[in-house]
Design a protein with these regions (language model features):
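Aromatic- and glycine-rich peptidoglycan recognition patches
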Residues: 74-76, 82, 100, 104-106, ...
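Residue-level "contact hotspot" at macromolecular interaction interfaces
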Residues: 39, 110, 216-219
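Boundary regions of SH3-family modules and the immediately adjacent low-complexity/disordered segments
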Residues: 1-15, 31, 52, 60-94, ...
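Second-shell loop/turn segments in exported
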Residues: 146-148, 169-177, 231
Length: 294
């Protein structure tokens, strides 16, 4: 009730926002001490549901609802929101920086893979970018690329991108190359290829096409999602997800991003998760209602 007194319902022309930092930390409640429930990346368009003090309740493209502090978001009217991107690119290096000039005199901000950049110009080997809050930065051309058309990539591309993150630490709520949880990892890998999939493993399992629930590994293709969990009170509970990379192996964010095997005789065998294996699903070519193109 104390919080309720501070809630502002925003006028229609101010219900749009774009993430302004390399990583926007999303909280379960409007407080920095609240649990980190997820993250979203620079350039992501969000819908603002309400304002409470210096916090905004937002809805991300994958329909995840959470709180972000005012420093992580730029508020726009509908016209500027829809017309913000002149040329939309994605940051494709794992981590890096935008600079105030092509001479790299000082850093404007850090950048992480998956950041969506608004390219407004070019100079030699650099692109000029504009941030949602109107800051200007310069980024090396080799570090960014046009956003993929989701029809143009294969499971092998998913695997190639997933391996870039080997060794990245586990972070509950993490969806960036600074730290991942299991579903944040799978979500980010697919985002790199222009597909927005749901945030949590329990949501991701509802998308795509079922390809295996009998441990028949020959049914799987590179890039398929593997789901793990347990049954309680007759209900299925999904608590982990990984990516099949072929040859009996999968890649996952568990302790850190690492490769494991489905075969007990393999030194990389992950007994804990394999005892909880539920099923595998194929996203590529089977984009169901919960999957969106970037």
């Amino acid at each position: 009730l104390i919080y309720q007194d501070n809630i502002d319902v925003l006028p229609k022309e101010k219900i749009y926002g774009i993430i302004n930092n390399s990583v926007g930390n999303l909280r379960g409640k409007p407080s920095h001490s609240s649990e980190l429930v997820s993250q979203t990346l620079l350039g992501t368009k969000v819908k603002i549901l309400k304002k409470e003090g210096e916090w905004y309740l937002i809805q991300t493209p994958e329909d995840y609802i959470s709180w972000i502090d005012h420093g992580g978001i730029s508020i726009m009217d509908e016209e500027n929101y829809k017309g913000y991107y002149k040329n939309q690119y994605i940051y494709s290096s794992i981590q890096g920086f935008a600079y105030n000039s092509i001479e790299k005199e000082s850093v404007v901000s850090d950048l992480v893979v998956g950041s969506i950049l608004n390219v407004t110009g070019t100079n030699g080997e650099f692109y000029k970018i504009e941030y949602p809050d109107k800051r200007i930065g310069w980024v090396s051309k080799k570090d960014i690329s046009p956003i993929f058309n989701s029809n143009d990539f294969s499971g092998l591309e998913i695997v190639r991108n997933s391996k870039k993150f080997i060794g990245v630490p586990y972070l509950w709520g993490g969806t960036s190359s600074k730290g991942f949880d299991c579903s944040g990892f799978t979500k980010t890998v697919y985002l790199m290829n222009g597909l927005v999939i749901p945030r949590d493993a329990s949501q991701q399992i509802n998308e795509g096409k079922l390809v295996d629930d009998q441990r028949k590994w020959d049914n799987l293709r590179e890039g398929d999602l593997m789901f793990f969990g347990y049954y309680k009170d007759g209900r299925r509970r999904i608590d982990h997800v990984s990516i099949w990379i072929g040859n009996g192996k999968f890649i996952q964010a568990s302790k850190n991003v690492r490769i494991n095997s489905v075969y007990p005789e393999d030194p990389l065998y992950d007994r804990y998760h394999m005892e909880k294996y539920i099923e595998s699903r194929r996203i590529i070519g089977n984009e169901t209602n919960g999957i969106k193109k970037l």
